[in-house]
């Protein structure tokens, strides 16, 4: 049992450490003492209060979990809230924050559903706050220090003044209001630039970033209202591919939209427009993989890479989270095969959740899929969702068995597919040869 101290906060979000209790962590539904070492809180990470959640610590004498009740700090008495870390790009959560729902503090029948963040277990170590996470992509071009810079508003204003293309209006909101790094790159003219393409979707994901049902927390993004034309998309794509510096690519399929391949005809035309103007850079799509024929048509038009998202290789758990309309997991796997048949670079956007994704049978199914299809890269994406909401979906679904841990899951994936790239960011054309 480690010596990391329990963190808790008051109602204003001021964080304290407990003088006696040690930190507990969560894996699935289980709250326990951590069995792995944490890392110092990464640059760009933050500590966040979990409203309506009591902190859960470990009694250092008995080793048993303890729900923290009313505390006294100085002259102040209050009911504490649990604390979690939120991580910067390039990091993957390995454990969840331990907590207990506490409805009484809100005068209602239930605690509020938490906003959409990838809540990570945190504690206090000897040298400061720590988080239970692993550094899965060390490339520095997605650093928080190089985004949301002081000159960004001016860059956005200049672009909006010079073009009436409505894509720039959407990207300006993404860049400034929601701090989307991919959208910001389009204004910085570097690396991966964003091209939102679709306002509609053929899935109803429980953790959708751009459209949530009534009673859920507000979406972290607002979906593009008017789907852009092929000409509008082609214009933005061509300019970025021709003029950007660094690891240059454009990607269709962003957090501010639905499923891009539902507009595959327009995107295919946009790709051809861009390629008529420049041969530079990479053209990429982020997709749920629901439409294999549509994806194949995009590769025929000039697409060279895709990232297909999934939370599980188990059909029942996949369906329960994505709530697909008119397709299933078998179609997603077919899309993966299409990408490889067309010579594309295939990334799997794996939505990870400690205690579910790393269950023994879940891990085995994922490893078989990655090896069988020939996935080039797995991007480990910590699922941004209230942990209790996801467990309601996953508790009785998916593969069984004890969790092996996110770190071991990553190691097993690499063993199953020699040469597999593990990371968090899409690879540009020049980065793919060294698979």
Predicted regions and their residues:
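Short, charged low-complexity linear segments at domain edges
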Residues: 167-191
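Active-site beta-loop-alpha junctions enriched in small/polar residues
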Residues: 255-257, 288-290, 311-313, 351-353, ...
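Auxiliary Fe-S-binding modules of radical SAM enzymes
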Residues: 1-160, 364-435
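Short cysteine clusters
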Residues: 201, 205-208, 252
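Conserved strand-turn element in the central/C-terminal portion of the radical SAM core barrel
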Residues: 323-325, 335-362
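Alpha-helix-loop-beta-strand connector modules within alpha/beta enzyme cores
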Residues: 264-280, 329-346, 398-423
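Core AdoMet radical
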Residues: 192, 196, 212-269, 275-294, ...
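Catalytic cores of alpha/beta
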Residues: 293-300, 355-372
